[in-house]
Amino acid sequence: GKFGENPEDVSAYASSSFYAVDRFASYTQFWKEDYQSGAVIVADRYSTSNIVFQMSKLPRDEWDAFIQWVQDYEYNKLGLPQPDCTVYLDMPPSVSQKLLSGRYHGDERKKDIHERNTVYLRACRESAAYAAKMLGWLVINCAEGDNAKPMEQIHRELMKELAGEINLYV
């Protein structure tokens, strides 16, 4: 919120750069050796998040170029590892809003600028669906109708999908 009140107040490219440099610092300081030794690394909100959250700020006819830019910048120029598998946990914003209201006990003021902006959240979901299709991500549907699936069910579905991707035994 320090750069504006709305996600669109900061350009997709500037925001992506901030997050990419933060990822670079994390990689070089904390997990580069593990990665290079062959460890399985699970990351929440890796470079693919830049694609989803920042691309949603752009006109649709610029999405392919933005995906290429993020991938070139992060993987080629910064030297960050490219993910072998990306999982997108899909949930309609209407369902996530219900969960947030519960988390914050109905106090809408506790939501951050992104959580408050349902137009932005819908745009992010649209950009995520596009990126998932274009980049071959695994998609796990985390809602049934107007309700979130139980975490245990999401976990089972995720493990089943991942079993084929990374040779897990479930």
Roles of regions detected by a PLM:
Residues 36-37, 81-82, 133:
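Short loop/turn elements that form and flank the Walker-type P-loop nucleotide-binding site
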